[in-house]
């Protein structure tokens, strides 16, 4: 099955976000982005000329093409809490995030101490640890895309991609796009 134009646009912007994070380097706090149709941005008469020129340079001319607008850098230790309380206006059709994490094989996780601080130190200093950068994007219409880069294979041609590589992060980001009810407001 061929991916939809929206899925392709989402994949392209997520890969662009990840490449941008790679240019900055490792050991950075998470960043969150609003994903907005480029055509919508270009239709704004108040858009500064230099920004419009940059957008046009990367725009493929389609209505589905997305631009990422960075919102803020997030503290590394509260990402789940921030996503749980984040709400996007209805005018934002998608969102993305970049975050770095340490992963270890399941058997190493099983060996970790019960105490959360001790477990973090154990994993962070374990010889089988792997540093990864995740870029995840979701759309209100349901599409998702993930890009994963490891520090050990830090090259654009070694970035893993897929629609649901990090299900928990996809779900958390998708929840931030859900409409806020009167009870939650």
What are these regions (language model features)?
Residues 1-19, 23-26:
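Short N-terminal edge-element motif at the start of the domain
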Residues 1-3, 50-59, 110-119:
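Intrinsically disordered, low-complexity linkers and terminal tails enriched in Pro/Gly
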Residues 18-72:
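N-terminal interaction modules that seed assembly of large macromolecular complexes
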Residues 31, 52-53, 92-95, 176-185:
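A contiguous, surface-oriented mixed alpha/beta subdomain in the mid-to-C-terminal portion of proteins
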Residues 40-42, 103, 142:
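Short loop/turn segments at secondary-structure transitions that flank enzyme active sites
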Residues 63-131, 140:
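Internal, well-folded beta-alpha domain core
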Residues 106-185:
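Glycine-rich, aromatic-bearing surface loops/beta-hairpins
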